[in-house]
Structure formats: C-alpha cells, structure tokens
Regions:
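ABC family nucleotide-binding domain
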Residues: 1-161
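C-terminal boundary and immediately downstream tail of ABC-type ATPase nucleotide-binding domains
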Residues: 163-191
Length: 191
C-alpha cells in the first residue's frame, strides 16, 4: 500500500490508515455536532490542528461540496445526499492521499445520487486516488481507470473500465452486468 509491503499486525498499518479517507454507506456523522463541527472533528482531535485553522479549512471543504450554507445545520436537518457530501468533506479534512468509498450512493434516494457523484467526479478530476465499491456502473465506466469485479470475496475479473464493463470475459461479470444494465431481461450485447 502506497508502495510499502504491509503486514496485518505491523505498526505501519496505523500510519497508513492515517493517509486514507473513508466514506461509509450510512454517513456516520455525529448527530450532536453541526456540519462544520463534524468536518473539524478529525483535524482538531486526531491531528491536533488549532480550531481556528480547522474551521477555515472546513469551510473551504464545505464550499467545495456545495454545502457552505449548511455549516451550522445538524445532520438531521439535511437530506441523505447532503449528509453524504458532509461525510466526504469530513474525510477530505484529514488530507488523505487516497479515499475509500463503501457504496456511497446506496442509501440515497435516486434524485440525490447525482450530487454525490458530481463531488466524486470532481475529486477524480483533481487526481484523488479513490477505491469505490459501487453498483453505479455508468459512473464507474466514466470515472474509473481500473475496475475489479468481485464475487464471493475474490476478484474474478479486473482491467480497464471500458474492457471489464464493455466486454466482460468472466461469466459471473457478464451475468451481473446483464442484470444491472438490462433489468428487464434484455440479453443483447452489453456494450
């Protein structure tokens, strides 16, 4: 990871984790803290940044995800898409070198998915390394450099996004894409 061999129980695991951001399915925001406080939490309490500096950086990140006007709101006052964008800002506040996304749109209403994907697309355009678990095949095809298809905990197919998603070779990948891209049973070509 990051060019280093990592043993599961090694001391370098903690150091490597601090170089990564994580965005979960269910946002995991602190309900008793405002949006701004949620974004400031890690830099202040984990990294020891001065609160004034963390606040300024958090406001910049909230602007980046389109939520500067919600800085004083609490998570319960936000839509799911807004909460997920706060979660992205919170992860970015730790200045990660790479970000992990675990189904970031699966808990959202369909009309809110686009806002979250737009933020992720911006991160990709800025060069952020992202590992994304997703069923958003259009997004994966558009943004991913590489796609890995997992089944039963194992990678059954991997390669360039256009190859894996446009011309899958493994029967399980073909079946999955057929079901996701053609839920009505249309079995014509996937490309």
């Amino acid at each position: 990871m990051f060019g280093e061999t990592v043993q599961r129980a090694s001391k370098t695991v903690h150091a490597l984790r601090s170089r990564m951001g994580m965005v979960f399915q269910r946002f995991n925001l602190f309900p008793h803290r405002t949006v701004l406080e949620n974004v400031m939490e890690g830099p202040v309490y984990v990294k020891g940044e001065p609160p004034k500096q963390a606040r300024e950086e958090a406001l910049v990140l909230l602007e980046k995800v389109g939520l500067s006007a919600k800085a004083d709101a609490y998570p319960e006052q936000l839509s799911g898409g807004q909460q997920q964008r706060v979660a992205i800002a919170r992860a970015l506040a730790m200045k990660p070198e790479a970000m992990l996304f675990d189904e970031p749109t699966s808990a959202l209403d369909p009309e809110l998915v686009g806002d979250v994907l737009a933020v992720m697309r911006t991160l990709a355009d800025e060069g952020m390394t992202m590992i994304v678990v997703t069923h958003e095949m259009g997004f994966a095809r558009e943004v991913a450099d590489r796609v890995c298809f997992l089944h039963g905990g194992y990678i059954v197919e991997s390669g360039a996004a256009e190859h894996v998603l446009g011309n899958p070779q493994h029967p399980r990948t073909q079946d999955f894409l057929r079901r996701v891209l053609h839920p009505t049973g249309d079995t014509r070509s996937l490309s």
